[in-house]
Amino acid sequence: DGRFASVLKNKNKYLNLIFKSKRECNILNLKSVISCIKKNKPSLILHCAGLSRPMNIHDRNISKSIDLNIIGTANVVKACKKFNIKIIYLSSGYVYEGKKGNYSEKDGVKPFNNYGWSKLGGECSVSMYKNSLILRVTMTEKPFQFKSAYTNLITNFMYHEDFVNLLPKLIKKRGIINIGGKTQS
């Protein structure tokens, strides 16, 4: 149902993927996730569900942010563990404070907003399961529509289409990988 998933559905040429709507696989309900996995028998889960925009929703509705990005992610991890299925979690470069750019996976995390905190919370549950890959990527649509969104932030936005092309090269990896485009401020 999300922006990235629709690009992935239309542009992906390399991976055999199935897509499930929120109604077909409700990440807020562990039984729903388990049922979806039993029915579809995936070899891996690309977890890109969650709450992202508008950014201020993470301040206005903290409960929704926690439910979708932390608890929902934990439910997906629990289900993956139950069936020994790899999870690839799309996190965000917003887990970093955004002051220097070009962050390494070894740099300390310090989110600058509640969205970053919610993605970091999701990362915590994914990190507990070793059959996993966390991709810290900050994606956006072409053309970039929010040029003045953050004037005091250094980021490495990557376009959805570029990430779709890169994804097949990453699916066998594990751990945490930062992915980004050209540094912008």
Predicted segments, located by residue:
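Substrate-positioning beta->alpha
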Residues: Q145-G175
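Conserved Rossmann-fold NAD(P)-dependent oxidoreductase catalytic core, especially the SDR/UDP-sugar
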Residues: A74-K110
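SDR active-site strand-loop-helix element
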Residues: K20, I45-A49, I87-G93, I134-V137
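Adenosine-cofactor binding site in Rossmann-like domains, unifying the SAM/SAH pocket
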Residues: K13-C36
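NAD(P)-cofactor binding segment of oxidoreductase domains
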Residues: L44, D59-I88
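NAD(P)H-binding glycine-rich loop region in Rossmannoid oxidoreductase-like domains
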Residues: L30-L68
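Active-site Tyr-X1-5-Lys
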Residues: K110-T138
